[in-house]
Swiss-Prot record:
One of its GO terms (molecular function) is ATP hydrolysis activity. The lineage of its organism: Bacteria, Pseudomonadati, Pseudomonadota, Betaproteobacteria, Burkholderiales. It is an enzyme of class 7 (translocase). This is Sulfate/thiosulfate import ATP-binding protein CysA. The complex is composed of two ATP-binding proteins (CysA), two transmembrane proteins (CysT and CysW) and a solute-binding protein (CysP). It catalyses: sulfate(out) + ATP + H2O = sulfate(in) + ADP + phosphate + H(+); thiosulfate(out) + ATP + H2O = thiosulfate(in) + ADP + phosphate + H(+). Belongs to the ABC transporter superfamily. Sulfate/tungstate importer (TC 3.A.1.6) family. Keywords: ATP-binding, Cell inner membrane, Cell membrane, Membrane, Nucleotide-binding, Sulfate transport, Translocase, Transport. ATP binds at residues 35-42. CDD domains: ABC_CysA_sulfate_importer. Its EC number is 7.3.2.3. SMART domains: AAA. NCBIfam families: 3a0106s01 (TIGR00968). It comes from Bordetella parapertussis (strain 12822 / ATCC BAA-587 / NCTC 13253).
Amino acid sequence: MSIEVRGLSKRFGAFRALDEVSLHIETGELVALLGPSGCGKTTLLRIIAGLESADAGSVLFAGEDATEVDVRQRQVGFVFQHYALFKHMTVFENVAFGLRVRHRSQRPSEARIRAKVLDLLGLVQLDWLADRYPAQLSGGQRQRIALARALAVEPRVLLLDEPFGALDAKVRKELRRWLRRLHDELHVASVFVTHDQEEALEVADRVVLMNAGRIEQVGSPREVWERPATPFVYGFLGDVNQLHGHATRGVWRLGEVALPAPDLPEADNQRAIAYVRPHDIDLARAGTAAPGIPVRLNHVYLAGPSAYLELARQDDQAIIEAQVPEPLFRSLGLKEGEALLAQPRRARVFAVQP
């Protein structure tokens, strides 16, 4: 079942949580709502679920207006960050809860409930824990049980609010890959909230970048990474250097450094910022003929296959970050305190707005 939101707005007092947000999600699609704290992503998720009401706009499921439909009638599965499992119930009883509290006319028989619960526990690969209590489970196991409970009521839509946020990094990585595989089996429209860029880019079919209550960009993980639509998206998705210069007729310049600025073909000495990823910066020793930004190597730290360099510009001491393969760093023989030239080889240039 598809999900569509049209012109959603929501205020909490003077704070504008959502500002005319519109979005369409297809059946079977896994969509990530990504952004910093306070950007509106959880508010949007809660309005879709029916846990929060919008001041304006509408929510449609499969083309039918569900804006005023009670949360209990929306057939939405919701998974919270902190599991919300009943401590006094076993794993089996937690998963069965949504089925057992249905109105008598809609409640399955105990035999069908048992079969359904065992099937779901098998789906999340935890059928062997049916008689355990939440306190006897790991964080990752609790989250999978919470997901099984959400699926027990056969939701038309699955919503997850930072489902792995309370878990350690290794477990989080394992579970998000598991969620991707599970979603492909279920084939329902799923939306999950996260502030973790890596999580969104790895798991989602599409990523919705949100900022200050508005959508900045919607696209596949590859699209938003390779072609960020706004300075915010560029800055939020990974590390980036911001180099202030000027653009004229599609060329950005800073001192002797020149880079293409195809988005600014009519610019005439316009202030512009080049957004450069650390891995798109080459290094040369000071005194070479090649153009570059004079810097001094402040600090180096090695992490796996890469060396991360903190460079201080010699004109204003602003920091530039560079990332080079560890073997290349060792072959260059660079030392902290050494004078170098930072040479950006690729950038996305945005005009400075007046």
